[in-house]
Swiss-Prot record:
It comes from Neisseria gonorrhoeae. GO terms for biological process: proteolysis. This is IgA-specific serine endopeptidase autotransporter. The signal peptide, cleaved at the inner membrane, guides the autotransporter protein to the periplasmic space. Then, insertion of the C-terminal translocator domain in the outer membrane forms a hydrophilic pore for the translocation of the passenger domain to the bacterial cell surface, with subsequent cleavage. The record marks 986-987, 1018-1019, 1121-1122 as: Cleavage. One of its GO terms (molecular function) is serine-type endopeptidase activity. The gene is iga. The active site is at 278. Residues 28-322 form the Peptidase S6 domain. Residues 1280-1532 form the Autotransporter domain. The keyword Membrane applies.
């Protein structure tokens, strides 16, 4: 039984189901748990399944990976199967395999793109079958196996197929065992476009009276393709084995619904062919050849009822050879000239007879001819070779007896490395097909009306002019398959508008010639225009088609309605013919436009349907329809090109190729979505050019079955676009020039643009996507462009990176540059009234000094230096701006050691809020400041606000902030001047006068050293008023305009009533606090002056009586004099523009300059200065626990920093690390009161702070905690314990918060495990050993740390009597530390400890009271390490501790259990200093006194004691100190 041609609603399923064994194995049944779109993409080599792809993983609808579509093999190219029906597979340039029972469908096939593309007519890729070549043509198909074996044909086409390269057929024969060998054939895959069904339980497919249960019908046959893998097992039922046939599945099995579901889930994309796929191919991957091969054609299936088995007819080599032998005339050999003579349909080339065709009907009569050697072929007459072609295996010239001789045939095949010079023409309308890797040179004379299609190799158009100087190589040329190159020897060889790039395109080599296109006709991204001529440039000019500007100019034709309620006479009226070429057609009260290639007699869409394959609905009214039709036509006229200009790097020789966009109107639009790598220039003289990426190609969703969320803006014609699945494009040219009000834009998914850009005459340049920009998508199926200006979703916007633009920009004469989601790397020179705008996602990296007339920022980032970091910077840039507005960020690279850095200079006007980001070169800065932002020449700065990102920047050892004076914003740190003489702070009036006379700053990168600034900047550790200001500034940045107004009020001296009520209240509150502070400071100053005088007198007396402890000890610099305060200082006006508000304006007058000629004291000598430290411990008042609170007194508290100044020379080793003299080093520049002198914690960088914090944490946990717990253990052992031996173990957990003026607040968590053994030597003597292991985790400010510590201690305890005892201990340990900021550092230190304790045990009934006192010496060695670029030297730390403790216990029994509650209190007076040197600057930290309170209980049962206790430790640097301990002891 044979198939009839499938038509909609014309297949009678009952005929097929009436017979269990039917030959109509035509269609696909697929699983339902995988998105249908995946099967579609797989069939069309789209999505992730492009040719050669190896990532073929498949996920189900729940996002779970269910395996690979193909295992360990590259993706196959399905284009060898015809694009519409998928029933004819090209295995030879002229032959395709199918089945003979589908002969009704084997007549015309299309390869490459689908029908209906705007740029290429359907007939261009049409191939007509001239002979089906049925296998055993007289043997009809039947139900027996033998009938199936003969169901096979190999059709011959009228032309060589150029769109696709043939696939090699299997050479393994027809035996099944070969194909069961997985070592040879590892994978099988099928494709088909028959009836489409999907397995779905509970539904059924019905046609006529027959039903297919658990099947849902999706589409009729030949509408679209599905591909996947067949069932896994080959011919389970051995009775179906036949040589030459291969089946998959079990013919004897009838699948239940569940079994079918399992069968369809054998592989990720398993599917089952049903109605509509007869003749569709099966492919196999041949591992021996490492390639896909054609295996067979689909001929048989087991029906809807079984759904269990399918079969293919294996390629028949002997049959193919027989056909080719019949179609080949033979081979012409020998050099020299050969004449081709004809007699009717017979001809001879020398002795070789060649059959010819008489007309198109007997084209199969034409034979192929092969030419070997080198020679000349002369056509004596016109040759109609029909379906015969010419195969050249040598160099040949083909010419006619005269210039008008023509040749018609299947095509020309030129072997690789060979060249044929073609000097004959082909008939008008005939298409000359060129295949083979060799070269064909067209070298005829005059005008040739024939056509050419280049499928492979090279074709050179070198046609000569005739006597009338007319030249035309071909009337039309197509470049297809991606394998061919067309070379033009002159620009007049062909009308460029008659050239097109078909399926997968190819190369057009302009070869130094200039070409002008109205539109470059192209199907897909395979098109490529190049210039391989390195001696001559080529210019490609695009003008675009004229746009329709008047909708009333569109023509309308009314078609007689199908019905009319008011007029029944229309039944009897004659039908008027419908004319072609009208713009609109009116019928049934609706207006329609005919699609390109649409049929006039086709039905028009109704019932809400907008379009079908032939018509598009345009509206109900003529005005609406004409407007829609005009937009529709204009969109079709967008000059879109999806190909690539020139060669990618390394893929050919790029000559100079220029592009010129000169639209026929200013509104003309051009869309480029392929990319470019030009050695030439892109010019836009008129029109609008848009560069864009493109969506990843996906197969059309004809039945709306895809479960993925598609982009609705581009879903017309069943197109599938996913908003976050696009392909990036790159564009490169020497220059891009835009002028005459033209525009040049880059949209989404343009990853790189490399070119210098020049814009003049009101031109607009928009680089990088921004919301509201046009997004355009060109359909590969139709060539139609759809554009949308709606904002992208966050998902889409985040799916592509910012466009990187490499090149300089020159703007003149009102030109404008707008950056969207883009990063510009280059210089900008803006002249005239040019404008530059940066948006939220914009970045600009300067590669040199730049000048911008008008710069507008919208939370944008400008990197003033293109160096990757400060270390690699060898030059610094200045940007000059005439007018600055908006809100943004400026990023600087600086070298404070050389007083160099990037700079912003604003000349005429400035408004907005700008954050400065600074990165300094490695090395310790020796400058106290550096100009960053200069707006001093701007008259009105009331709306300009400049702040430092994160409020500070770490440069070397110090932390800098900014200071603004007279419009100049500069880096500033009050400690940076330490170690150098500092002038007295001028009064506000004097400061104002000096600023007024300040010399003009230079514009270059070399920045003059600024004058001293004495007002301390805000910092993260400032008081509550400063913190409120900082938070307000942050909110202002987010809210932009509100922020600007708030900052304006905070800085401006002439504030008006327009301030918001909240800001007024804040300023008034600050003023009140300032007044209170002034009064307090005045009183404190007087008291401090008296106190200081007394202290100086005591110090002088003490030093006079003190003897030096070492011969080499140096003199100590006396403390600086007390500052002099005056209330007048607080009332004076301050002209500074610092953002720290009113508090920053409080500048006390200093008494005299700080004396700076002092000598340093080696840190190790501090260990011998216990007396001096005790004096210091009592010298100062204790500091408030809130380190942020502003104190009016100088920083003389024992928490205060010891030093932040720079040593003149580095220490020779860690033990020689020097510390600056106590208070002298502490004061920043002039000895200022606390309100102006920031604490060391606020002034040091992250690395310095981390080093200080780690050193303090190590001191506390290693030296102090370990000794304290050992002392407690010794004290709590009673004399009764001395009579027994014991072992014990304890585990202690700590949670601590630290705060000090020496370092910023941090927290620490620590666990400590101790194991000990106690041994009794006598009733009065005990000894013991303790092994301690601890692990600490620290969370520093923007850093972290980890310590592991191991220490061993020995102790002895002797009882003098029943009450008094004396104890001593000694120990040593090792500390391993890891510090993590933005860099890592690992280093080790060692520790030693020794202690002596005296105590007494008082027993009153059941009460025990144990007072004790002792002394302990602990020392932690030095360390030397690198933290990033900073060299860190940590001095050894020695702590001398005086302890006093009191333990209170009460003992009682509960049965055999003794319960002993415990209370204890201890005081630790710690004397010790440590130092950290970072980059040559020294900083100190101290151990402070601490109190500890504990409570717990001991449970004694026989010889086992369990202790549980918790403790709280208090100290000046310890905010929250809690710990808990569990201890178990066994006596024996």
């Amino acid at each position: 039984m044979k198939a009839k041609r499938f038509k909609i609603n014309a297949i009678s399923l009952s005929i097929f189901l009436a017979y269990a064994l039917t030959p109509y194995s035509e269609a696909a049944l697929v699983r339902d748990d995988v998105d249908y779109q995946i099967f579609r993409d797989f069939a069309e080599n789209k999505g992730k399944f492009f040719v050669g792809a190896t990532d073929l993983s498949v996920k189900n609808k729940r996002g779970q990976n269910i395996g690979n579509a193909l295992s360990n093999v590259p993706m196959i190219d399905f284009s060898v199967a015809d694009v519409n029906k998928r029933i004819a597979t090209v295995v030879d340039p002229q032959y395709a395999v199918s089945v003979k029972h589908a002969k009704a469908e084997v007549h015309t096939f299309y390869y490459g793109q689908y029908n209906g593309h705007n740029d290429v007519a359907d007939k261009e890729n049409e191939y007509r079958v001239v002979e089906q070549n049925n296998y055993e043509p007289h043997k009809a198909w039947g139900a027996s196996n033998l009938g199936r074996l003969e169901d096979y044909n190999m059709a011959r086409f009228n032309k060589f197929v150029t769109e696709v390269a043939p696939i090699a057929p299997t050479d393994a024969g027809g035996g099944l065992d070969t194909y069961k060998d997985k070592n040879r054939f590892s994978s099988f895959v099928r494709i088909g476009a028959g009836r489409q069904l999907v397995y779905e339980k509970g539904v059924y497919h019905q046609e006529g009276n027959e039903k297919g249960y658990d099947l849902r019908d999706l589409s009729q046959a030949y509408r679209y393709a599905i591909a996947g893998t067949p069932y896994k097992d080959i011919n389970i039922d051995q009775t179906m084995n036949t040589e030459g046939l291969i089946g998959f599945g079990n013919h004897n099995k009838q699948y239940s619904a569940e079994e079918l579901k399992q069968a369809l889930s054998q592989d990720a994309l398993t599917n089952y062919g049903v109605l509509g796929d007869s003749g569709s191919p099966l492919f196999a991957f041949d591992k021996q050849k490492n390639q896909w091969v054609f295996l067979g054609t689909y001929d048989y299936w087991a029906g809807y009822g079984k759904k269990s088995w399918q079969e293919w007819n294996i390629y028949k080599k002997e049959f193919a050879d027989k056909i080719k032998q019949h179609d080949n005339a033979g081979t012409v050999k020998g050099n020299g000239e050969h004449h081709w003579k004809t007699t009717g349909t017979n001809s001879h080339i020398g002795s070789t007879a060649v059959r010819l065709a008489n007309n198109e009907g007997d084209a199969n009569n034409g034979q192929n001819v092969t030419f070997e050697d080198n020679g000349t072929l002369v056509l004596n007459q016109n040759i109609n070779q029909g379906a015969g072609g010419l195969f050249f295996k040598g160099d040949y010239t083909v010419k006619g007896a005269n210039n008008d001789i023509t040749w018609l045939g299947a095509g020309i095949d030129v072997a690789d490395g060979k060249k044929v010079v073609w000097q004959v023409k082909n008939p008008n309308g005939d298409r000359l097909a060129k295949i083979g890797k060799g070269t064909l040179e067209i070298n005829g004379t005059g005008v040739n009306q024939g056509q050419l299609k280049v499928g492979d190799g090279t074709v050179i158009l070198n046609q000569k002019a005739d006597a009338d100087k007319k030249v035309q190589a071909f009337s039309q040329v197509g470049i297809v398959s991606g394998r061919g190159t067309l070379v033009l020897n002159s620009s007049n060889q062909i009308n460029p508008d008659n050239l097109y790039f078909g399926f997968r395109g190819g190369r057009l080599d302009a070869n130094g010639n200039d070409l002008t296109f109205e539109h470059i006709r192209n199907v897909d991204e395979g098109a490529r225009i190049v210039n391989h001529n390195t001696d001559h440039a080529s210019t490609i000019t695009l003008t675009g088609k004229s746009l329709i500007t008047n909708p009333n100019s569109l023509s309308v034709h009314s078609i007689q309605n199908d019905y009319d309620e008011d007029d029944y006479s229309y039944y009897y009226r004659p039908r008027r013919p419908i004319p072609q070429g009208k713009d609109l057609y009116y019928k049934n009260y609706r207006y329609y436009a005919l699609k390109s290639g649409g049929r006039l007699n086709a039905p028009m869409p109704e019932n809400g349907v907008a379009e079908n394959n032939d018509w598009i609905f345009m509206g109900y009214t003529q005005e609406e329809a004409r407007k829609n039709a005009m937009n529709h036509k204009n969109n079709r006229r967008i000059g879109d090109f999806g190909g690539f200009f020139d060669e990618e790097n390394g893929k050919g020789h790029n000559g100079a190729l220029n592009l010129n966009f000169n639209g026929k109107s200013a509104q003309k639009r051009f869309l480029l979505t392929g990319g470019a790598n030009l050695n030439g220039k892109i010019s836009v003289t008129q029109g609008n050019v848009l560069l864009s990426g493109r969506p990843t190609p996906h197969a059309r969703d004809f039945v709306n079955k895809s479960s993925a969320r598609k982009d609705a803006h581009f879903s017309k014609n069943n197109e599938v676009v996913f908003e976050d699945d696009w392909i990036n494009r790159t564009f490169k040219a020497a220059e891009i020039a835009v002028n005459q009000s033209a525009s040049f834009s880059s949209g989404r998914n343009v990853s790189d643009i490399t070119a210098n850009i020049t814009a003049t005459d009101n031109a607009k340049v928009n680089l990088g996507y921004k919301n509201g920009d046009e997004v355009c998508v060109r359909s590969d199926y139709t060539g139609y462009v759809t554009c949308n200006t709606g904002n992208l979703s966050d998902k889409a916007l985040n799916s592509f990176d910012a466009t990187r633009i490499n090149g300089n920009v020159n703007l003149n004469q009102n030109a404008a540059l707008v950056l969207g989601k883009a990063a510009l790397w280059g210089k900008i020179q803006g002249q005239g009234n040019s404008r530059v705008s940066l948006n939220q996602h914009s970045k600009w990296h300067l590669t040199g000094d730049s000048q911008v007339h008008n710069l507008s920022l919208a939370d944008s980032h400008i990197h003033l230096n293109n160096a990757s970091d400060a270390q690699s910077a060898n030059k610094y840039h200045t940007i000059k701006i005439n007018h600055l507005s908006g809100n943004g960020h400026f990023h600087y690279l600086t070298d404070l050691a050389k007083n160099l850095g990037d700079k912003v200079l604003v000349k005429e006007s400035a408004s907005g809020h700008y954050q400065l980001h600074v990165q300094n070169k490695t090395g310790e800065p020796n400058q106290e400041g550096l100009d960053l932002f200069d707006a001093s020449s701007v008259q009105d700065r009331s709306r300009l606000f400049v702040s430092l990102a994160n409020h500070y920047v770490d440069l070397g050892a110090l932390r800098y902030t900014i200071k603004t004076e007279n419009g100049i914003t500069r880096l500033y740190n009050p400690y940076a001047g330490n170690g150098r003489p500092v002038k007295p702070a001028p009064s506000p009036a004097a400061n104002t006068a000096s600023q007024a006379q300040k010399a003009t700053q230079t514009d270059g990168a070399q920045i003059a050293k600024p004058q001293n600034i004495v007002v301390a900047p805000p910092s993260p550790q400032a008081n509550q008023a400063e913190e409120a200001l900082r938070q307000q500034a942050k909110a202002e940045q987010v809210k932009r305009q509100q922020a600007a107004e708030a900052e304006k009020v905070a800085r401006q001296k002439d504030e008006e009533a327009k301030r918001k009520a909240a800001e007024i209240a804040r300023q008034q509150e600050e003023a009140r606090k300032a007044a209170e502070l002034a009064a307090k400071q005045k009183a404190e100053a007087e008291r401090k002056a008296r106190e200081l005088a007394r202290q100086k007198a005591e110090e002088a007396s003490h030093q006079a009586n003190a003897k030096p402890k070492r011969r080499r000890r140096r003199a100590i610099l006396p403390r600086p004099p007390a500052p002099v305060f005056s209330l007048d200082d607080y009332d004076a006006k301050d002209n500074s523009e610092s953002s720290i508000g009113n508090l920053a304006r409080v500048i006390p007058r200093m008494g005299r300059e700080l004396i700076n000629d002092y000598e340093e004291i080696p840190l190790e000598e501090l260990e011998d200065e216990a007396e001096e430290e005790r004096r210091q411990a009592t010298q100062f008042h204790s500091k408030s626990r809130n380190r942020r609170a502003i104190s009016s007194e100088p920083s003389s508290d024992e928490d205060a920093s010891e030093s932040v100044s720079t040593s003149d020379k580095h220490p020779q080793d860690n033990t020689e690390l020097h510390e600056k003299v106590e208070t002298a080093g502490l004061q920043p520049r002039a000895a200022q009161p606390r309100t102006q002198a920031a604490a060391q914690a606020d002034a040091v960088s992250t690395n310095t702070n981390s080093a200080l914090s780690d050193a303090m944490a190590s001191t506390q946990s290693i030296l102090l905690d370990t000794g304290a717990y050992l002392t407690r253990h010794i004290a709590q052992k009673s004399r009764a314990d001395a009579e027994k031996n014991s072992v014990w173990m304890s585990n202690t957990g700590y949670g601590r918060d630290y705060a000090s003026a020496q370092y910023r607040r941090f927290s620490s968590k620590r666990t400590q495990t101790q194991i000990g053994i106690d041994r009794s030597l006598s009733e009065n003597m005990q000894i013991g050993g303790v092994l301690t292991y601890s692990d600490s985790q620290h969370t520093f400010d923007q850093a972290g740390g980890k310590n592991t510590f191991v220490q061993a201690n020995l102790y002895g305890k002797y009882y003098l009597n029943d009450a008094w005892y004396v104890a001593g201990d000694i120990g040593a340990g090792s500390l391993r530390s890891r510090l993590q900021t933005q860099q890592k550092a690992n280093f080790n230190r060692t520790s030693i400890q020794t202690g002596l304790t005296l105590g007494n045990t008082l027993k009153i009934n059941q009460f025990e009271i144990v007072p004790s006192a002792g002394i302990r010496y602990s020392r932690l060695s030095s360390a030397d390490y690198k933290l990033g670029d900073d060299s860190v030297k940590v001095s050894s730390m020695a702590v001398k501790t005086l302890t006093a403790g009191l333990d209170f216990a009460y003992r009682f029994k509960v049965g055999n259990l003794t319960v002993k509650p415990l209370l204890s209190a201890a005081y630790f007076a710690n004397y010790g200093k440590g130092g950290v040197n970072v980059g040559g600057k020294s900083f100190a930290y101290k151990a402070d006194n601490q109190q500890q309170y504990s409570a717990g209980v001991a449970l004694l049962y026989r010889n086992v004691t369990l202790n549980v206790n918790g403790s709280i430790t208090k100290g000046k640097q310890l905010e929250k100190q809690k710990s808990g301990q569990i201890k178990i002891q066994i006596r024996f």
